[in-house]
A protein has these predicted regions:
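Small-residue (G/A/S/T)-rich helix-start motifs and N-terminal tracts that mark the onset
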Residues: 1-133, 142-159, 164-297
Length: 297
């Protein structure tokens, strides 16, 4: 299988126009985080901000707001009412979410939401309303796997980012079967799925239709809870900025892995954390900008 290259990724990011503003780089709506998992919300939000989205709106539980707002100053927060167990529910937040969905350039749903009926209802309603690229991760994927009727409403601008376990649930098979033949699993799924699939793992596969490519960056130190939240935020930010779903997925996978490689070199594979990827993203994008400048000279 062909591999992504640094040259290809650099081509996705032209020089920013001096006469630009935050609207130029898109509005990303993140529907993320239950009371139990504010960290997933924080990681995906910071990743989106570090990846250049013009405006990041975060729909998360009221209890999460003091935690997030005291650490992440650049996001706009939409406080969500919750179920008794602290998960976002559609019914209590429909008016706010409907308005936010209309204004979004891309939507990320799933990170830290919780795998319950409330999340399934939330996803079902978002799918019915969203027109822009929709990135589904984590519990968004678990909700999708539990609601076949949602999958029947699929659109070409959907991006799914499953790890092998989530892929198994989406495909109705086992994790072992997915890992035994990852390229075939991705190809078979995309015969029925019209969007872009990002099958995470060693050699992440990005597939859309019959087009597939593998990511060469990344390392075992990234095998920690939270790394996927960073990836989801990056892909969503690129989609909000106008990259096609496939290109956004390719850029996200490659640059996420590169940040992981930088983090491993700095902190070691053993000790590195997902938040260290965020610390390394400026270095990643600086490398990209320096490469672009060198070509222009």
């Amino acid at each position: 299988m062909q591999e992504l290259s640094w040259k290809t990724i650099c081509g996705y990011f032209p020089k920013r126009n001096r006469n630009s503003h935050k609207g130029t780089f898109g509005t990303l709506l993140c529907i993320t985080g239950s009371n139990r998992m504010p960290g997933a919300c924080a990681l995906s939000t910071l990743a989106a901000l570090r990846s250049g989205a013009g405006l990041v709106k975060v729909a998360t539980t009221e209890r999460n707001l003091p935690i997030l707002a005291s650490q992440i100053y650049e996001a706009v927060y939409l406080p969500m009412q919750t179920t008794k167990i602290g998960e976002i529910c559609w019914e209590k937040n429909a008016v706010v979410l409907q308005s936010a969905l209309k204004q979004a350039s891309a939507v990320l749903i799933g990170c830290g939401l919780g795998n319950t009926a409330a999340t399934q209802e939330l996803l079902r309603n978002v799918v019915n309303l969203v027109e822009c690229p929709l990135i589904m991760d984590a519990d968004g994927l678990n909700a999708l796997a539990s609601c076949i009727d949602i999958m029947q409403k699929q659109k070409p601008n959907w991006i799914l980012t499953p790890h092998p376990g989530e892929m198994a649930r989406l495909s109705g098979t086992t994790t072992a079967a997915v890992q035994a033949n990852r390229p075939q699993c991705a190809a078979e799924f995309c015969k029925q799925f019209s969007g872009t699939l990002v099958l995470k793992g060693a050699g992440t596969i990005i597939q859309q239709g019959t087009t597939a490519i593998q990511n060469p960056t990344g390392n075992p130190g990234m095998s920690r809870g939270g790394s996927g939240d960073v990836l989801a935020g990056m892909i969503a930010a690129f989609a909000a900025q106008g990259l096609s779903p496939y290109d956004a997925a390719c850029a996200g996978a490659y640059l996420h892995g590169l940040a992981g490689d930088f983090a491993a070199a700095r902190y070691s594979e053993q000790a590195m954390l997902p938040q260290d990827l965020l610390h390394c993203l400026p270095e990643v994008f600086l490398k990209l900008e320096q490469e672009r400048t060198a070509k222009e000279q």
